Amino acid sequence: MYIKQQVRAGERLDDLQRSGYHIIQNPEKFCFGMDAVLLSHFAEIKRDSRVLDMGTGTGVIPILLCAISDASHFDALEIQEESVDMASRSVAWNGLEKRIHITQGNIRDASSIFGRHVFDAVITNPPYVNDKHGLKNPKLPKAIARHEIYCTLEDVIREASEVLKPKKSLFMVHRPHRLPEIFETMQQHRLEPKRMRLVHPYIHKEPNMVLIEAVRDGNPMLKVEPPIIVYEKEGKYTQQILDLYK
C-alpha cells in the first residue's frame, strides 16, 4: 500500500531504527517516548511467548519487540480509537499482521477480553499521574495517556496478574515516587517484584523512571540492577542509550 494511503494529514512516519520498522504518529495527539524504548529492552521475552501490551498507544512496544525478541504473538490493548487506528496501520505498514493483533478496550477489562492465565508475559507503560486536578479536558489524548482517567494503577496490576500464567512476568515502567504503592499493590495481587532498574536523566539528577519486573506467584527476592543514565550532557545521549539503537 502506498505511504499516502497509510499516513494521514497531521501524521508522520517515524523510523524506529530496528529491522526497517516504522511507526505512524500524530504529534498533536501523543508520541512515544524514551520510556517505551527502555521498557522494550528491559523486558526479557522468551521464544514463542504470547505477550500482552496493556495500553499500547500507537503500538510502538510490540513493534519494537518484534525486532528484538522471538515472541510468537503480541496482543495489544488500547482504549483510544484514534490510537487503535494508527497502531493498526503501523502494524500493516510493517507487515506484522500475523504477529501483532490490536484490540480496542479498557485495561481494567483485560481479563474479560482475553481470559485468565493465558499470557507468558505482560508489558505495560501505563498512565503515571493519579492526580486529576487541573485537567482542562480529561478527554484529550495526551491527558488520557498520562493520567489515571480510565484505569488506575491497581487496575493495571490486578489485570496483569489475572491474565498472566503462574510464574510468568509483568514488565512495567513507572515513576520512582510511586514505588511503595506499586510494590504493595503488586504483592496484594500475587505479583512479586523480582527485578528493578532506575533511570536517571543525568548522572547527578534523581531518577525519573523505574523499570520493574514482577513474577506471578514468585518467591520474594528483588534484584536491583545498575542504573541507566540517559544523557551525558544536554542533547548528547550516553553510550548506554546509543547502544540500544545498534
Predicted region positions:
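Conserved SAM/SAH cofactor-binding pocket of Class I
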Residues: 42-135, 158
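Class I SAM-dependent transferase core
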Residues: 3-46
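Short, structurally constrained coil/turn elements
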Residues: 17, 45, 96, 187-190
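Conserved Class I SAM-dependent methyltransferase catalytic core
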Residues: 150-201, 205-207
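SAM/dcSAM-binding transferase cores
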Residues: 206-246
